């Protein structure tokens, strides 16, 4: 699912949407801004629009992808600038992706650290290191 992040980071939103299952659920309820759930490809488009309303140049840097069966834990950072404040942000972020039929069916964003995201998929730090 590296291709989803690559598409989003280079601004190719339609490619990212193509990689999503028609029934995708994007859970952004852990986020400070726009904390809600988005459903379907139209929901994904709305999330992208909502993100643009708050951030300039928002992108993610992925440091690690951890395989958890049909799920993937992505550890990295969110980088961008607040539209209203002009404050540059670079904060740790973890995301959990669920794959079905080779497509992204669930995108859970807003985990603030690695441990929290690993627990969401039933893994411990030890489990994650064993797979490395």
Where in the sequence are the language-model features?
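C-terminal and inter-domain tail/linker signature
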Residues: 1-132
């Amino acid at each position: 699912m590296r291709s989803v992040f690559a598409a989003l980071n280079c601004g190719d939103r339609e490619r990212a949407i193509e990689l999503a299952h028609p029934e995708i659920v994007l859970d952004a309820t852990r986020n400070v801004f726009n904390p809600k759930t988005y459903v379907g490809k139209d929901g994904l488009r709305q999330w992208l629009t909502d993100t643009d309303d708050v951030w300039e140049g928002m992108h993610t840097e992925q440091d690690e992808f951890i395989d958890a069966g049909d799920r993937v834990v992505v550890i990295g950072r969110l980088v961008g600038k607040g539209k209203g404040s002009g404050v540059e942000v670079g904060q740790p972020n973890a995301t959990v992706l669920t794959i079905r039929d080779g497509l992204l069916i669930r995108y859970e964003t807003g985990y603030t650290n690695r441990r929290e995201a690993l627990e969401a998929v039933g893994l411990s730090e030890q489990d994650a290191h064993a797979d490395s």
